Structure formats: structure tokens, C-alpha cells
Regions:
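A ubiquitous short alpha-helical element
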Residues: 6, 74-75, 144-146
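A generic structural-conservation signal
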Residues: 31, 57, 76, 135, ...
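Pocket-lining segment of extracytoplasmic ligand-binding domains
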Residues: 35-36, 40-125
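Residue-level "edge-of-site" marker
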Residues: 61, 80, 139, 175-176
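Secondary-structure end/capping motifs
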Residues: 95-169
Length: 179
């Protein structure tokens, strides 16, 4: 409370989650929330030890090696109140090349639906990202990829939360978001 949250950039997940955490903790969003832009995880590793930012909020499995071996320590978790990733396309692109967009979505959905069934995927991820095998296995057990578009209820809930946090000024009509 009242310290500087290191964020990758304004509008990023680390920035948005700082607001969610502040609200969860009952902080005054204007007085108790300050930011230091550090750009990336590498920036956090470099800048936080220098005092440029006091804490940061990043995906726990990505940062776990730096918690296990230093220089960071986990002080808590703050689950996202919305999906972590969505696919967004500009209206013009969707109008001009809907077939390609649908093909890309089919490929992504097929790949994510089958991802956990890839033989030794846990070992491949562990080796590629220098993560402990048991951490990758835990991540895989917790991670789900939706095969459906967000519902109007989900989008409305996210927008209401962003308005409440004063991160957007008003809700956008659902027809402009969901296609």
C-alpha cells in the first residue's frame, strides 16, 4: 500500500492486476497505487533490486524460478477475475479476411484442445523454459484453454469491473466486441 508497483507497461496485465489487488485489499486507488514501468520480466529482475519498484505482479509459474532461486519471493497470489488471454481482431481485418481469421481460430482451438495430449509436452516445456518438471506439470494441470468465444455475460462482467476500477470510462456495446 502506497508503494510503487513495477509494471511492464500501462494497460498490461501487470498494470490491470495491480488495480485488482488494490481493490481486493481495500486501498484507495488514487492515493495508494503508484507505478514504475520496467517493461519486462528482465526489466523487473534488473530494476527492482535497484529500488525501481517495490513489488510486481506476474504469472506465478513464469516467475517461480526467480522465487525458488532468488532474487524474488512470493508474498501472495491474486487470481485474475477474467480470462487471461483473448484473441482480438480489428473490424477491418475481420471484414476483409474473415476466412483467414476463422482458419487461424480453428488451428488455435485444435492445437490447444490437443496440447496436453502431446507426448512428453511437460518435458519439452520444462527444457525449453528451464522450469522444474513438477512446476510444468502443475501448470498443465491448472491451465485450460477455452474452445468457445466469450459469452456476453463474461464480457459484460469484465467491462463492469474495468469501469468500476476506472480503467475505462464506459462499457462498449457488446455487438462491437463479440462477432
Amino acid at each position: 500500500k502506497g508503494t510503487a508497483c513495477a509494471i511492464s507497461r500501462y494497460g498490461s496485465g501487470s498494470h490491470l492486476m495491480a488495480y485488482v489487488n488494490a481493490e481486493n485489499e481495500g486501498w484507495d486507488l488514487e492515493k495508494d497505487l503508484n507505478f514504475e514501468v520496467i517493461k519486462s520480466l528482465e526489466g523487473a529482475l534488473e530494476e527492482l533490486p535497484k529500488g525501481n519498484g517495490d513489488y510486481f505482479m506476474w504469472e506465478k509459474f513464469t516467475t517461480k524460478p526467480y522465487v525458488d532461486d532468488g532474487p524474488f519471493r512470493r508474498v501472495g497470489e491474486c487470481p485474475t477475475p477474467w480470462p487471461c488471454f483473448v484473441i482480438a481482431v480489428r473490424d477491418k481485418v475481420l471484414q476483409e479476411d474473415a476466412l483467414s481469421i476463422n482458419t487461424i481460430l480453428e488451428i488455435i482451438n485444435r492445437t490447444t484442445a490437443e496440447f496436453k495430449d502431446i507426448p512428453s509436452i511437460d518435458r519439452m516445456i520444462s527444457n525449453r523454459y528451464q522450469q522444474k518438471l513438477e512446476d510444468v506439470q502443475q501448470w498443465l494441470s491448472l491451465t485450460q484453454w477455452s474452445q468457445q468465444q466469450l459469452t456476453s455475460t463474461e464480457v459484460s462482467r469484465v467491462q463492469k469491473k474495468l469501469v468500476q476500477l476506472e480503467l475505462i470510462t464506459k462499457e462498449v456495446p457488446l455487438a462491437r466486441i463479440l462477432r
